[in-house]
């Protein structure tokens, strides 16, 4: 197939990691892929298959795109005879206006990356507004891919039919994200967090919880990977030698850090079983995360520990449980690795995406 992908690429966030992985997987499967993007970096494609448009970044994750980009994308799709156009929703304004060209576009598939916000807060209200804008523009897309089943109910409430919805969770490169052949035991319990430094990811809760746990167990460390609005709070925290902040790094470098750790912690209050969680599981780490959305169903009791949202005491208790029991950490980690290998490798996810493309093409011909 000739496949067009409208997305940002190359940034260290879940959307870009998924977009990069889908592009790589489709090329590996023999498809001709064209990227429509405002990103400077697109790996794995020749220059003639990268079609750029101008954009102004409103924040690290969303852009105000050139008003001419939807028309330009439509024209290139027609010229190249693209079979299916895949839009990664929630990266820029182009996705909002492409549906106005639906009658001229090839069959379309859109992936929703926003998770439904649980609870009441300023941040969940922002996510709800973004949801409504995305849902409004999605009505004219032919097929819709959700990254979390908990999104399905809310999307159907807006009148989108179930037969156009497919749930294809994030995948993991299980060869890159693999357990260490041998882990050094220095007597320190190492916890790690990977993601945005933001309130919705529960970083403030994590810092409070680790501070309390470290007072009880000085032989413990916390490593944080990522950047975001809580950067200044992190900078203050790293004055303590027990906390290390690495910042933003290349995605390919994350496994070597995870392989040195004992447990992964992300007390988020929005979303489900995110990509960073599954990558940690693939490296054989037990997980401490929040009992929200599909996480309750997807993470078994013998794979990690679920805590209540906004609860630092719960996180402290979970750290105690894992910190005190090396055998438990090991057994949980082995089960996490097996689950990712069996259910969440990118090879399986790409095949599911291809099936959605085929359905979009078949339905458009009717």
Residue ranges and their predicted role:
Residues 233-249:
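Nucleotide-activated donor-binding/catalytic signature segment of Leloir-type glycosyltransferases, i.e.
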Residues 301, 305-312, 321-326:
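Conserved acidic donor-binding segment of nucleotide-sugar-dependent glycosyltransferases
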Residues 84-106, 110-117:
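An aromatic- and histidine-rich active-site surface loop
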Residues 286-289:
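Short hydrophobic beta-strand element within catalytic cores of glycosyltransferases
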Residues 16-21, 189, 193-212, 224, ...:
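A conserved mid-protein helix/loop that constitutes part of the nucleotide-sugar donor-binding site
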Residues 269:
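Aromatic "clamp/platform" in nucleotide-sugar-dependent glycosyltransferases that forms part
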Residues 150, 171:
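Carbohydrate-associated surface elements
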Residues 107, 116-140, 174:
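Nucleotide-sugar donor phosphate/pyrophosphate-binding loop at the beta->alpha transition
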């Amino acid at each position: 197939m000739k496949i067009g992908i409208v997305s940002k690429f190359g940034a260290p966030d879940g959307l870009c990691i998924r977009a990069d992985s889908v592009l790589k997987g489709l090329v590996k499967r023999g498809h001709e892929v064209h990227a429509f993007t405002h990103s400077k970096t697109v790996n794995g494609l020749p220059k003639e298959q990268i079609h750029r448009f101008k954009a102004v970044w409103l924040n690290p994750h969303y852009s105000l795109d050139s008003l001419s980009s939807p028309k330009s994308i439509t024209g290139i799709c027609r010229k190249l005879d693209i079979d299916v156009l895949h839009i990664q929703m929630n990266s820029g304004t182009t996705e909002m206006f492409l549906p106005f060209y639906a009658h001229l576009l090839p069959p379309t598939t859109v992936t929703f990356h926003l998770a439904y916000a649980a609870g009441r807060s300023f941040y969940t209200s922002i996510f709800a507004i973004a949801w409504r804008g995305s849902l409004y523009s999605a009505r004219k897309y032919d097929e819709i891919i959700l990254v979390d089943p908990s999104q399905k109910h809310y999307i159907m409430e807006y009148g989108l039919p179930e037969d156009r919805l497919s749930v294809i969770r994030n995948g993991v490169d299980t060869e890159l994200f693999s357990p260490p052949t041998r882990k050094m035991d220095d007597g320190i319990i190492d916890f790690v967090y990977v993601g945005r430094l933001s309130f919705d990811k529960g970083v403030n809760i994590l810092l409070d919880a680790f501070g309390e746990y470290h007072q009880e167990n000085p032989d413990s460390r916390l490593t944080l990977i990522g950047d975001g609005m809580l950067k200044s709070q992190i900078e203050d925290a790293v004055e303590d030698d027990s906390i290390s902040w690495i910042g933003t790094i290349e995605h390919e470098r994350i496994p070597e850090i995870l392989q040195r750790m004992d447990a992964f912690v992300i007390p988020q209050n929005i979303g489900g079983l995110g990509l960073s969680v599954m990558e940690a599981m693939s490296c054989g780490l037990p997980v401490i995360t929040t009992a929200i959305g599909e996480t309750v169903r997807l993470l078994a009791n013998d794979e990690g520990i679920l805590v209540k949202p906004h609860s630092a005491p719960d996180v402290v208790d979970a750290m105690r449980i894992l910190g005190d029991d090396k055998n438990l950490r090991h057994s949980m980690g082995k089960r996490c690795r097996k689950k990712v290998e069996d259910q969440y490798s990118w090879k399986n996810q790409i095949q599911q995406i291809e099936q959605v493309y085929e359905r979009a093409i078949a339905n458009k011909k009717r």
